[in-house]
Amino acid sequence: MTRIDDKFAQLAKDGKKAFVAYVMAGDPNYETSLEVVKGLPAAGVDVIELGLPFTDPMADGPTIQLAGQRALEAGMTLQKTLDLARAFRKDDQTTPIVMMGYYNPIYSRGVDRFLAEAKDAGIDGLIVVDLPPEEDSELCLPAQAAGLNFIRLATPTTDDKRLPRVLQNTSGFVYYVSITGITGAAEAQAVDVGPEVARIKSAAALPVIVGFGVNTPEKSKAIAEVADGVVVGSAIVGKIGAGQSVSDVLAFVKTLADGAHSV
């Protein structure tokens, strides 16, 4: 059992939905980013998604692309992302952290080395958006052997023929991308999401968390009503990008978390 498994088991026992927050590691700089991440649990965040900055983030919309650029320009690296997670773990041993990013930085570091370091830093799971299930032997299977969850994305275009392949080695939870396209580009609609969540849950005994296009407390509540939880990324990252104070960012996060938890 990972921290992710424990968290979702506890939420299910309590009859609660999960609120997951995405932030880019090192945006706008290491110190501010760490302060934000440290404040997320008290703002109601159940699982933290920590973005790994990358030079070619093909699945990300402009808001998160800019966050990655800011982080890279401030000197953020894979090593510093691991350092940030380790610093967070000094004060918090229970909140799960999922590292989300692309395969190239991991491959460049060496898979075995990366997995050992990630585990040691307190990372609990990985989302690697550019590794399809056909490449499970590259990272997915070694990650799970190392005790990390490997979380897959399902989309509206993942048909019934493809879905079992996507879910085959998925663990922790399934991240349902509620819209086609890049992050932050459109809004999720609960009426569309509900049947898709049911379809995925019928194929895998895992929580289904919905992201992409959730940007208000009302939307967070609406999506949480038809899923096991909700992910918000671009809306939070946009506040950081606008130069809002850490306290203002966390206050906004709390409104989103309260929306999801009000179900």
From Swiss-Prot:
The keyword Lyase belongs to this UniProt entry's keyword annotation: yes
Active site as annotated: 49, 60
Taxonomic superkingdom: Bacteria
GO molecular-function term, one example from the UniProt record: tryptophan synthase activity
GO cellular component terms given for this protein: cytosol
InterPro entries: Aldolase_TIM, RibuloseP-bd_barrel, Trp_synthase_alpha_AS, Trp_synthase_suA
Self-association and partners: Tetramer of two alpha and two beta chains.
Annotated protein name in UniProt: Tryptophan synthase alpha chain
Organism: Roseobacter denitrificans (strain ATCC 33942 / OCh 114) (Erythrobacter sp. (strain OCh 114))
Lineage: Bacteria, Pseudomonadati, Pseudomonadota, Alphaproteobacteria, Rhodobacterales
